[in-house]
């Protein structure tokens, strides 16, 4: 099958080439009257026998124009005007003058589509039959297309002319049958069908019934050469730049874009704006330019003296928030705050240690699960402890900041506890954060109603460490996390220290959770101010 198809294609190529070089002559008909198709074929044979004036050029082209000039055939004139003037149809009268009959805009392109397909428009059949001059040739109409759109001189515009043959279609044949049978004579259905068959035989081209594949390939090749630039993709591309499409784009450019295309319109305008900007970024070659900076003389005199006070800037030192002057302790000061609570079967006990070392005015803090055997380890100062222990201590700052940390951690424990909480305090050293006696433990607590003041939001919960130091079922955080919450980069204004009752213990009811933001000194100061 593949081999037979290749042979048919080769046969079609040979037939087309031989017909272009040496076309066979047709037999003369007995009637002596030739149709327009026979005239065109005879003209084709005649032109093929002539030698071309220029080599590599053919003379057997533009046959319809040559036939019209030889026999002065009547034509339908179609004028294509530039811009928005549209197009018009002209018919020639008996006196030889052309008269314009129809003028349409380019938006109404139905007639142009028929002309492009070389078909006779059915809507023009009645108009052409009423013409003073017969323009039908074997059922076909010769149309002359005059294109004024390429002319540059608008005062006396010239045009480019070409001729096309409009062939009848089944629609035009139906119109002819209807116009012929619309007289007073009674036509039966058989008479109408017979009339239609005779019209088809008179207007149709010769039909080849040879079942050879080469005939189909030859017809396909001839049709391809004639409609090579008349395909649907090519029409779609050319239609974008047609006059009707340009007019529609111009009308839509003044209208606001739809909401779905606002982004596309913005990008298009920005692209046009950037395209209009031109920058001269040419870099001259080395040696063609003069460096004026190097050529300018540099006369700088060395000053004999410099006024330092004139150019120096003095930065004021930051004053401490403590109302009390900085005290350098003579001994180590350590305060331990132990918080105890019982929830269900769990016993929780944590310890907050505030330490001030010898020769250091700053206070340090440490939060850890309280154990009796770790009492000796907690005595070690941050400056003398190991690397692991030193990482657990965090810098608090002044004495006021240390008191604020104690208050905040106490509020945190009472807000997070689901059971009564007991706090005990013990201090050692020359001075203590509280006014109690040295080394004597105290117990105190604050009512839960006071803790709710100033809290406007309900933040995520923070859990307390268990007594064993490990988190139980993910409900408690570690001591390092709590210490990180208590750090404050900028100390807030000092707040009044709440009074703690000695050796008193108050059970707390269930309270709500507190966020890490409540641990900062700033949030604590807001609650005390409120």
From Swiss-Prot:
Residues 424-436, 466-475, 514-530 have a biased composition (Low complexity). GO terms for biological process: gastrulation; positive regulation of gluconeogenesis; positive regulation of transcription by RNA polymerase II; regulation of transcription by RNA polymerase II. Keywords: Developmental protein, Gastrulation, Phosphoprotein. The modification Phosphoserine is found at residues 296, 515, 520. The modification Phosphothreonine is found at residue 490. InterPro entries: Spt20, Spt20-like_SEP. Interacts with ATG9A. Interacts with MAPK14. Belongs to the SPT20 family. This is Transcription factor SPT20 homolog. It comes from Rattus norvegicus (Rat). The lineage of its organism: Eukaryota, Metazoa, Chordata, Craniata, Vertebrata.
């Amino acid at each position: 099958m593949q081999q037979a198809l290749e042979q048919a294609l080769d046969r079609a190529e040979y037939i087309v080439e031989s017909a272009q070089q040496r076309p066979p002559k047709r037999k003369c008909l007995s009637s002596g009257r030739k149709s327009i198709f026979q005239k065109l074929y005879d003209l084709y044979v005649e032109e093929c026998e002539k030698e071309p004036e220029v080599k590599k050029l053919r003379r057997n082209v533009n046959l319809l124009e040559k036939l019209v000039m030889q026999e002065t055939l009547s034509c339908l004139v179609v004028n294509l005007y530039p811009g928005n003037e549209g197009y018009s149809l002209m018919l020639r009268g008996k006196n030889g003058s052309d008269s314009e009959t129809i003028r349409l805009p380019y938006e109404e392109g139905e007639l142009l589509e028929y002309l492009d397909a070389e078909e006779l428009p059915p809507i023009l059949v009645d108009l052409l039959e009423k013409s003073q001059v017969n323009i039908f040739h074997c059922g076909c109409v010769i149309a002359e297309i005059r294109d004024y759109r390429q002319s540059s001189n608008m005062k006396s515009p010239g045009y480019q002319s070409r001729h096309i043959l409009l062939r009848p279609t089944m629609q035009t044949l139906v119109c002819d049958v209807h116009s012929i049978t619309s007289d007073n004579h009674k036509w039966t259905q058989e008479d109408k069908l017979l009339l239609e068959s005779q019209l088809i035989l008179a207007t149709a081209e010769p039909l080849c019934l040879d079942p050879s594949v080469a005939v189909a390939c030859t017809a396909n090749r001839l049709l391809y050469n004639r409609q090579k630039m008349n395909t649907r993709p090519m029409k779609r591309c050319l239609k974008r730049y047609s006059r009707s499409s340009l007019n529609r784009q111009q009308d839509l450019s003044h209208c606001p874009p739809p909401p779905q295309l606002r982004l596309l319109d913005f990008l298009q305008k920005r692209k046009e704006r950037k395209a209009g900007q031109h920058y001269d970024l040419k870099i001259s070659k080395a040696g063609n330019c003069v460096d004026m900076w190097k050529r300018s003389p540099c006369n700088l005199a060395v000053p004999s003296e410099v006024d330092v006070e004139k150019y120096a800037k003095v930065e004021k030192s930051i004053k401490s928030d403590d109302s009390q002057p900085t005290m350098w302790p003579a001994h180590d000061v350590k305060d331990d705050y132990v918080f105890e609570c019982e929830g269900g079967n769990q016993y929780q006990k944590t310890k907050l240690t505030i330490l001030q070392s010898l020769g250091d005015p700053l206070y340090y803090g440490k939060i850890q699960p309280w154990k009796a055997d770790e009492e000796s380890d907690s005595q070690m100062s941050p400056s003398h402890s190991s690397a692991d222990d030193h990482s657990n201590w965090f810098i608090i700052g002044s004495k006021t900041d240390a008191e604020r940390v104690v208050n905040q951690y106490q509020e945190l424990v009472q807000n997070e506890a689901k059971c009564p909480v007991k706090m005990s305090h013990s201090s050692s050293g020359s001075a203590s954060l509280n006014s109690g006696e040295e080394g004597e433990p105290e117990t105190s607590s604050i009512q839960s109603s006071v803790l709710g003041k100033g809290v406007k939001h309900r933040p995520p919960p923070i859990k307390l460490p268990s007594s064993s130091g490990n988190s139980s079922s993910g409900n408690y955080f570690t001591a390092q996390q709590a210490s990180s919450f208590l750090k404050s980069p900028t100390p807030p204004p000092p707040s009044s220290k709440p009074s703690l009752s000695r050796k008193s213990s108050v059970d707390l009811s269930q309270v709500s959770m507190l966020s890490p933001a409540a641990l900062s000194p700033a949030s604590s100061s807001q609650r005390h101010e409120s």
